[in-house]
Amino acid sequence: MQLVGSGNQAKRHPLFTADGSVTTGGTPQLILPETPSRSFLMLQNVSAGPLWFEFGSARATAALTNGAISSITVTNAGFNFSKPPVVRFAGGGYSGNTAFLGLNQPGGDGPNSSIVAGRVARAHCVMTGSAPNLSISSIVIDDHGAGYAIAPYVFIMNSDLDPYGCAVPSATSGMLLSAASAPYLLNGTSCFTDAIAVFGATTGQAFLCRWMT
């Protein structure tokens, strides 16, 4: 995608539409699956009641004991999966200095063997339900890892074979757009490509969704 008005915008860049309404009140609903590219996104609530939107895959947190992951708690089981999503651990290492408290975010160093014997943990998802509406029932630790300074960030991402799984939106989870509020816009240097889902309490609540690749 080239910037509008630039000399390199020499082909069509259409705006795609995924407008809709809540099919069944009180039930999460997928709006868009994960996409290879997305340069613009607009979401707007045009109904008379609040709507909640969620982005990306399921979510979980890790607990640490003596430098190793001791347990993983699923905080958002996700929905609409046909394949188990992938679990990755980000950050949590000493970053070459045992005085460092660790950074439990993507981009933070993981444990390694440079100053203490360390290795990154491994885990996999156990699913419940039937495809295409699987959700995560638990996460099994295959390798507890070693040498963590702080519990790492648990990053759950959809399988390459399944772009349709998404975090569950609800009245207590997700981005709230109030009735007839201003649109949520992403336009410029970055726009996520994650799956997007919506939740509304009442059947028929309408929303707008427009995007560009």
Residue ranges and their predicted role:
Residues 35-38, 45-50, 79-82, 148-149, ...:
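Short proline/glycine-enriched turn/loop motifs at strand-loop junctions of beta-rich domains
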Residues 25, 80, 147, 178-184:
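Glycine-centered tight-turn and secondary-structure capping sites
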Residues 30-33, 172-193:
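Beta-sandwich interaction modules
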Residues 19, 25-56, 210:
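Beta-rich globular "head" domains
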Residues 1-28, 199-213:
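C-terminal interaction-tip segments
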Residues 43-50, 55-56, 157-161, 198-203, ...:
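Short, flexible beta-strand-to-coil junctions
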Residues 39-41, 188-205:
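Noncatalytic modules at the cell exterior or secretory-pathway interfaces
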